[in-house]
Amino acid sequence: MAEVRAKLAPGIPIDVWCQDEMRVGQKNKLTYRWARKGSRPLAVHDQRTQSTYLFGAVCPELGTGAALVLPACNSEAMQLHLDEIATKVSPGAHAILLLDQAGWHGAKILKVPSNITLMPLPPRTPELNGQENIWQFMRQNWLSNRIFKSFDDIVDHCCYAWNTLIDQPWKIMSIARRDWTTMGHSM
């Protein structure tokens, strides 16, 4: 983060964002449920395969985020998401975007907006990315153990889940915050 700070004009605030994407579809994952001890709770499970991708990013310090529901997970979709994130960065601030090393995150065709710097996380370290915990929370609360009727139903549920989360900034702050990500504000 110090390298990014050195390249910016003095006094420009840095917002640290976490980015990731998840597949949501008819053949969805099962999650834990509350049930009486000794019982075996039932959960529906669909064998159809329609799905979509939810690209999401949050700024845990500010409790805000940016997301898109897209039909594919590739560099074109990543470009759309970067452009969306750029519109949500605080005015006059610069964003450091933490992300994993998926191929489309570092594609040469990406045109990274001027108010964003990409910062790849080390390989196989999902615990460093607060967005992973956001996905877990969304699955447990809104997106799992259900049958989606159609592709549009999947998209509607993704939008509902994200919009419900965004309306609760304290949840984003609580779930995705890492102590070391606040360094950008104090430098």
How would you label these PLM feature ranges?
Residues 77-96:
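Short, basic/hydrophobic alpha-helical segments
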Residues 107-115:
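Short, aromatic/basic amphipathic alpha-helical patches
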Residues 92-105, 129:
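Acidic/histidine-rich, metal-coordinating catalytic segments
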Residues 12-16, 131-187:
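C-terminal anion-handling pockets and recognition modules
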